């Protein structure tokens, strides 16, 4: 399924540089994602020293945002959307950071410094120098010094020849300038620093004084792994110190919710460079969660008539040439393996295999819909800068399915898929999501299957269902799969950019490429339509999201260890014997239970159980043994509850069987 792992991200994304110098300021502001924490942004510290007049974007004076206005040009920035003001501030702060870096590293050369969801960044080539953690403080100190100077930020229009001369020793800027048209090139001056940029910017560096550089990493130039690795430094800027402080607190909270930290603390998965970057390995406890997710979704699908299959992780190059993926997706695939005169590739998706399963036998209209599902292992060569734990890797497992339907069944089957998505979200308590109808860009004939009638029909079909179901959604041009439009359900993880959890894609293209058919009621051969869908998306990514949403405080049915039993005195045979009896009673009901009878202090064992996010911590003392009770504490709670052993076992069995969310999210 093409949408899986396909959303645009800031790290390593090549789309940013292509349009960076060509877009108008209003489009730049539109495209840059706002920070999620500034919804209530009310600051008026940004001062717009311009003529008060209605802002009219239709007059093609986009250069007037914060520029020395020309005759008859004026802007009313007071009415401009507040988050757009914040983006402008962050973009200006990127220039402030670049100026500071240039002061400290005179050899520095800069690529681009856009605004992204988490603030801003700038890619820089420092030659032999490498930015380390201790250097960040030095850069911040220089930035504060420059901001305090109160230098004005001024826009200048220059000719292409002037720009080439101005940046003649900077191959990165020359590369940008080469794509620009003469008469449409601007630079910004602030004191002794000049940068090539379309803007917009605030008019004084002192407005950028409330900033923080938050991290640094490597990034390929233009997002291409064949190019040099530049140093990328991220930062964030706010109009007031109070807003900055609040945001930094949110960042600290986000770090605690990062699934990579939780996975390490709970011993769930690991990544090792010797195995390969982007190739996570699930440890025993992590694999328990993975299996529970697999069983959960397969059981739901079986009740809806899905037929589960297993297909190989490789296929011939010819298979992907037939499907069209070789032409449209080759750059995201691992290179071919040549063996005995055949070329094989690790599969990046499962559609071609499922097409061949359908083609294995003849079908009548009476057979349709046919719903083929699989928990499938897929491989995609993601750039190293985009890799992120189990949320985004080079190997992942998709909860994939392909529904083969007649044209008359499209809307009904699409409705059932949408219902399945939202019933699943209800089970997991997922409420904060955004629905996106991804459409083709009609002007891009190379990216998409060229059939206007097919596209119009497919897009209208999905719109109809979404409107009938009264689902709020936005449309995004140019984000469809190459073979058809799709519905993506996106969520915001604790760290990083928005991700896609679920997707449903409508496809008139692949069935024809594979010559699939069914016999209709008139005895004529017809081509089926295919719905590609993934409810959990990839199990890896879904697991990462749930870990972050719950801070690892999983519902009991999903927890790798559901109960930990701890005798107060580990050297007392009677207490240890009763603790083992409790474990036996729970194991008989398929409860995942651990006996912790190590010769450690009880407080130490309790704290370890809390770090491991075990839902039920049971303490066995002499009172519990005599009364045949259990004394337990739910994770995230301080109160202790005492129940008879049989009653506790029954309670826990019911909670797990019915997948109750008794304590999920208690640490939120």
Sequence positions of predicted segments:
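Cysteine-centered motifs
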Residues: 28, 35-37, 64
């Amino acid at each position: 399924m093409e949408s899986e792992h396909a959303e645009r991200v800031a790290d390593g994304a090549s789309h940013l540089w292509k349009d960076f110098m060509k877009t108008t300021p209003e489009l730049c502001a539109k495209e840059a994602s706002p920070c999620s924490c500034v919804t209530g942004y009310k600051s008026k510290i940004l001062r717009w020293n311009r003529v008060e007049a209605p802002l009219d974007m239709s007059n093609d004076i986009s250069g007037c945002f914060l520029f020395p206005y020309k005759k008859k040009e004026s802007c009313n920035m007071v009415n401009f959307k507040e988050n757009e003001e914040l983006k402008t501030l962050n973009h200006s702060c990127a220039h402030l950071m670049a100026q500071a870096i240039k002061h400290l590293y005179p050899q520095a050369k800069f690529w681009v410094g856009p605004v992204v969801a988490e603030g801003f960044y700038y890619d820089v080539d420092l030659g032999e120098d490498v930015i380390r953690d201790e250097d960040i403080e030095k850069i911040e100190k220089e930035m504060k010094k420059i901001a305090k100077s109160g230098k004005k930020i001024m826009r200048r229009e220059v000719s292409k020849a002037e720009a080439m001369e101005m940046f003649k020793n900077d191959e990165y800027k020359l590369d940008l300038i080469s794509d620009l048209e003469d008469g449409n090139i601007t630079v910004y001056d602030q004191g002794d620093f000049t940068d090539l940029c379309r803007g917009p910017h605030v008019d004084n560096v002192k407005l950028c004084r409330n900033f923080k550089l938050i991290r640094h990493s490597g990034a390929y130039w233009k997002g291409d792994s064949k190019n040099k690795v530049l140093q990328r430094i991220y930062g964030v800027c706010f109009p007031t110190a109070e807003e900055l402080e609040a945001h930094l607190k949110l960042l600290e909270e986000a770090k605690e919710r990062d699934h990579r930290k939780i996975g390490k603390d709970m011993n769930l998965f690991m990544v090792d460079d010797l195995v390969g970057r982007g190739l996570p390995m699930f440890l025993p406890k992590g694999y328990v969660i993975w299996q529970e997710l697999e069983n959960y979704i397969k059981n739901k699908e079986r009740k809806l008539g899905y037929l589960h299959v297993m297909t190989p992780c490789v296929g011939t190059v010819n298979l992907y040439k037939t499907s069209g993926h070789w032409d449209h997706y080759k750059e995201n695939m691992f290179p071919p393996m040549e063996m005995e005169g055949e070329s094989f590739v690790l599969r990046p998706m499962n559609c071609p295999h499922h097409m061949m399963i359908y083609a294995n036998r003849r079908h009548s209209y009476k057979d349709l819909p046919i719903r083929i599902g699989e928990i499938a292992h897929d491989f995609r060569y993601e750039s190293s800068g985009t890799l992120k734990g189990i949320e985004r890797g080079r190997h992942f497992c998709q909860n994939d399915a392909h529904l083969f339907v007649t044209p008359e069944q499209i809307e009904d089957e699409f409705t059932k898929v949408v219902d399945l998505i939202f019933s699943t979200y209800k089970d997991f308590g997922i409420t904060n999501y955004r629905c996106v109808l991804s459409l083709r860009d009609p002007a891009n004939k190379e990216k998409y299957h060229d059939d206007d009638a097919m596209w119009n029909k497919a897009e209208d079909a999905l719109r109809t269902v979404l409107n009938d179901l009264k689902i709020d959604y936005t449309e995004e041009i140019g984000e469809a799969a190459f073979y058809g439009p799709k519905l993506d359900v996106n969520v915001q993880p604790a760290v990083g950019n928005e991700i896609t959890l679920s997707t449903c894609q409508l496809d008139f293209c692949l069935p024809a490429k594979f010559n699939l058919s069914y016999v209709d009621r008139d005895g004529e051969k017809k081509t089926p339509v295919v719905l590609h869908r993934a409810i959990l998306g990839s199990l890896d990514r879904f697991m990462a999201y749930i870990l972050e949403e719950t801070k690892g405080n999983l519902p009991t049915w999903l927890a790798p260890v559901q109960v930990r039993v701890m005798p107060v005195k580990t050297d007392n045979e009677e207490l240890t014997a009763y603790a083992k009896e409790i474990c036996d009673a729970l194991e008989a009901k398929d409860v995942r239970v651990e006996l912790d009878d190590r010769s450690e202090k009880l407080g130490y064992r309790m704290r370890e159980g809390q770090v491991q996010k075990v839902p039920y911590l049971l303490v066995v003392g002499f009172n519990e043994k005599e009364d045949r009770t259990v004394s337990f504490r739910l994770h995230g709670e301080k109160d202790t509850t005492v129940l008879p052993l049989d009653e506790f076992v029954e309670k826990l069995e019911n909670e797990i069987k019915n997948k109750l969310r008794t304590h999920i999210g208690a640490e939120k």
